[in-house]
From Swiss-Prot:
Name of the encoding gene: Fsn
Keyword Secreted in record: no
Lineage of the organism: Eukaryota, Metazoa, Ecdysozoa, Arthropoda, Hexapoda
Protein name per its UniProtKB record: F-box/SPRY domain-containing protein 1
Species annotation: Drosophila mojavensis (Fruit fly)
Function: Required in the presynaptic motoneuron to down-regulate the levels of wnd and restrain synaptic terminal growth at the neuromuscular junction (NMJ).
InterPro entries, sorted: B30.2/SPRY (IPR001870), B30.2/SPRY_sf (IPR043136), ConA-like_dom_sf (IPR013320), F-box-like_dom_sf (IPR036047), F-box_dom (IPR001810), FBXO45-Fsn/SPSB_families (IPR050672), SPRY_dom (IPR003877), SPRY_FBXO45 (IPR035784)
Amino-acid biosynthesis keyword on record: no
Residues in B30.2/SPRY domain copies: 58-250
Amino acid sequence: MVDPLCNYNVLEAIFSYLELSDLSRCSQVCKSWYHFLNDENSDVWRWHCLRKLPKESIKSDLLASVTTYKTKLRAYLHAWNPNDCSRNVYIKPNGFTLHRNPVAQSTDAARAKIGFRQGRHAWEVIWEGPLGTVAVIGISTKEAALQCHGYVALLGSDDQSWGWNLVENHLLHNGDMQGNYPLLNNAPKYQVGERIRVILDCDDNTLSFEKNYEFLGVAFRGLPAKKLYPTVSAVYGNTEVSMVYLGTPLDG
């Protein structure tokens, strides 16, 4: 009779060296493999996490909302794209934080590595430096511009992007102000370091936000059936913005 522990160790060794795409297929082979890979804190996911993520990120407070090795790895794979941002932006070694260089008369944006056209998705945005005169968070398609002259609300300036300007509490799309947000009397302004949760519902075609675990309401409706990417645009020199993908939002 084969020792179950032996089987476990063999599977662990094999799965630790497979590509992530192969692990997804392996989980569909049988119930045993599915349950094995469903343990998000197993040594398999720990190994892949250690192999992919910068060491400084794994135990960082930045990832406090993603508590397992698998969710940390998923967040990293969904983080800012160093190849899809303004030339005045670079992604820091932790992989989750963008830094805007102090370039005068420029507005600069960055998109995430992965966009969505199906399902429900949530991510956190943390502005870790001064906002400046304009600081916008939201979504865009691949067609939206990532750099322009001057200090403007770049995200939301065309029909390919939708944003919330944290400085003035305005919603922006197609170059127009779509209204105040949130719809509260004397709505408090964003404070540097606060975590804002962005919720994209591709099934209902809506974009919403939460702050301090309070749902702020639906910001945009009627979003197009296109792949939409987490995006921010910034104007302040040396400001930094982090983004952590959370997965499917929990209702309530």
